[in-house]
A protein has these predicted regions:
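Bacterial N-terminal signal peptides that target proteins for export
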Residues: 1-8
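Short, polar/acidic, helix-capping and beta-turn segments at strand->helix junctions
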Residues: 20-186
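C-terminal motif of bacterial Sec signal peptides marking the signal peptidase cleavage site
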Residues: 15-18
Length: 186
């Protein structure tokens, strides 16, 4: 019992020191002011495309309070064509990863269009990754990592999110990947 009390006192003392420390507060403010996802995209050589128009009766994004919901999007290339095919037969895991990464770039373009300034992203909350895959394919997370790795590279800690990575028997237009997402914004 004495050991528990000593540990609690030590933890309380440490938290009081860190809470009252102006250096700790400044460090937090520095991290916030250094957050510049658009500069990060530039440094990575990524140029955001113009968001594509929805192909049916829906919109690319809907804001509800401080949440922005993005519709499912796919790996649309600069030439206007999608990366298509099934991972496990037509595409390798690496090609699927690149399709998911491209889908992430397209989703960031929609974020930019909706928000004007990507530094308004407070947190990527959730992504649902759907992989067009053969029935025996089991590496869906490795494919959707293309999206998740990009979000963390661009948004840092704010890019870490919850996620589903599932296989589908087919996707619209035979696209390789479709990903939708929920984002908390400022």
């Amino acid at each position: 019992m004495k050991k528990i009390i000593q540990t609690l006192i030590l933890c309380l003392g440490l938290s009081m020191v860190s809470c009252g420390s102006p250096q700790g507060q400044n460090k937090s403010e520095e991290v916030k002011s250094d957050f510049n996802p658009e500069a990060k995209l530039d440094s990575m050589g990524i140029v955001l495309p113009q968001p594509s128009a929805p192909v049916a009766n829906f919109v690319n994004s809907v804001q509800v309070g401080n949440l922005l919901f993005l519709s499912g999007n796919g790996p649309l290339k600069q030439d206007g064509k999608f990366i298509t095919g099934k991972v496990g037969s037509d595409l390798t895991i690496e090609e699927g990863y690149e399709a998911a990464r491209l889908t992430g770039i397209n989703q960031i373009a929609i974020l930019k269009s909706a928000l004007g300034d990507l530094s308004r992203v407070k947190r990527i909350i959730r992504a649902a990754g759907m992989v067009n895959a053969t029935p025996d394919f089991k590496q869906h997370p490795a494919v959707v990592n293309g999206f998740s790795d990009l979000m963390v590279a661009v948004f840092g800690e704010r890019g870490k999110h919850t996620r589903a990575a599932v296989g589908m028997v087919s996707l619209p237009f035979n696209i390789a990947v479709e990903i939708d997402m929920i984002v908390e914004i400022e």
